[in-house]
Amino acid sequence: MATYLDFEQKIKEIENELEAAKARGDTAAIEIFEKDLQKEASKTYKNLSDYQKLQLARHPDRPYALDYIRLILDDAYEIHGDRCFRDDPAILCYLGYIDGQKTLVIGEQKGRGTKNKLKRNFGMPHPEGYRKALRAAKMAEKFGLPILMLIDTPGAYPGIGAEERGQSEAIARNLIEFSMLDTPTISIVIGEGGSGGALAIGVADKLAMLKYSVFSVISPEGCAAILWNDPAKVEQATKALKITAEDLKELGLIDDIIDEPFMGAHRDKEGAAKALKEYYLQNIRELMQMDPKERLEKRYEKLMKMGRFKE
């Protein structure tokens, strides 16, 4: 059963009418409701606010990293553990083939259902998760394998244990190491890109976002609480933070925006996976043909351009 967001109620009503028409075999009504649905959905999705895009990025049916891995990666083999503490289920590392191209895929996984969400810690990695990602990345570098990273986290886990085991050090270490990694890298925000938790696997030759994903230094709820001491101002905070793919492309913080299927990736997971796969293959082949020294220089130049002040 489809999950509808608050701004999709008219769409829900039309789809319910459409299903009823299909159940009774009313061909004329089906045609009318299909046209109505197309018209209403086009109008709704053409005028989405930043907050509505945030809702889509967090949609409970939105495909997660593991969904994409299962749809695009052949002969997948999972890598476990950081060799220092434990295996963190919030970070996935898989070796496999994407259309014949050997690839390491690193992804942040939120989980579905209560048990799985708890297992994945709601997609909030511990330091051992980031260390696992770095261990796998270093192995890929050693064997000359390109890396695809899928970002989807509300943020790094801020618990006492995580801080005691060096959460900030693990994130900082990844920023350093991934900036110098001598192998082609592509990072894609597939849902939420939350602060340092996202940056830890976000330093790459190419950084892209799915159309309805978000990337931010803080959650809009956290921003509203700090600036106005009022959680009700979350919509105002969302707009002020400039967290959408369009905003970040305009600011020069991301390289590309990957289009999503009509009404979002959750409506067509296979279509979303196809678009992501095509983007990866097109760009990774270009990166692999570049001189390694030139590729690293371009990555460095891109990072150095970030954080410019503009009035």
UniProtKB/Swiss-Prot annotation:
InterPro entries: Acetyl_CoA_COase_a_su (IPR001095), ClpP/crotonase-like_dom_sf (IPR029045), COA_CT_C (IPR011763). PROSITE patterns: COA_CT_CTER. Residues 34-286 form the CoA carboxyltransferase C-terminal domain. GO terms for biological process: fatty acid biosynthetic process; malonyl-CoA biosynthetic process. The keyword Cell wall biogenesis/degradation does not apply. Keywords: ATP-binding, Cytoplasm, Fatty acid biosynthesis, Fatty acid metabolism, Lipid biosynthesis, Lipid metabolism, Nucleotide-binding, Transferase. GO terms for molecular function: acetyl-CoA carboxylase activity; ATP binding; carboxyl- or carbamoyltransferase activity. It is found in: Cytoplasm. Its EC number is 2.1.3.15. It catalyses: N(6)-carboxybiotinyl-L-lysyl-[protein] + acetyl-CoA = N(6)-biotinyl-L-lysyl-[protein] + malonyl-CoA. Pathway: Lipid metabolism; malonyl-CoA biosynthesis; malonyl-CoA from acetyl-CoA: step 1/1. Component of the acetyl coenzyme A carboxylase (ACC) complex. First, biotin carboxylase catalyzes the carboxylation of biotin on its carrier protein (BCCP) and then the CO(2) group is transferred by the carboxyltransferase to acetyl-CoA to form malonyl-CoA. Belongs to the AccA family. This is Acetyl-coenzyme A carboxylase carboxyl transferase subunit alpha. The gene is accA.
